[in-house]
Amino acid sequence: MSTDKSVTQDLILTLEDGKAGFAKAGEKAAEAGNPEVAGYFYELSSQREGFAKELVEMAADYGDETEEHGSLGGAIHRGWMTIKDAIGGSSVAAVLDVAVQGEAHAVKLFEEALAEDISPDLRRVVVRQLAEVRTAAQRVLALQSMNA
């Protein structure tokens, strides 16, 4: 597997995890009565879906096939969110705590992707997406502080 294909596949899985995780977090925030946080989580879910589609299309242009099913780590993270909800309820603060962890993980994976020997075209996309993921991570941290 080429480095571009491997990196692209890893990022697509991470982004699919984010899409699903933020959709679930949006549901939990809505149930907890916080439409602002819920709306932002739904926005991030849509953003991650768009990022994944961009990478899938880029890979297809190069003749690579990719999977869009999410990773085992992401499934575990979403499972952890479900367990945490069962134990600690579905408070916005609890959901934000999990979202902060998820965003830190996403930033780390994007940074690791940039450490790889990837093509200039893929690097440009990853740099741009990482900047937006970092911005989202900062906003999630700010929301966490406001809802503590």
Model region roles, listed by residue range:
Residues 57-107:
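Carboxylate-rich helix-loop segments that flank metal/cofactor sites and access channels
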Residues 31, 61-62, 119-120:
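Surface-exposed helix-capping loop/turn segments at secondary-structure junctions
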Residues 36-73, 140-147:
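Conserved alpha-helical segments that form or flank metal/cofactor-binding pockets of metalloenzymes
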Residues 2-32, 94-117:
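Alpha-helical bundle segments that constitute or directly flank the non-heme di-iron/ferroxidase center
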Residues 4, 10, 77-78, 148:
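N-terminal/domain-start segments enriched in small and hydrophobic, helix-friendly residues
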Residues 95, 99-148:
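Preference for long, well-ordered alpha-helical segments
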Residues 19, 26, 52, 59, ...:
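A structural signal for well-ordered alpha-helices, especially hydrophobic packing surfaces
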Residues 3-14, 34-53, 92-96, 121-135:
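Alpha-helical scaffold segments that form or flank carboxylate-/histidine-based iron centers
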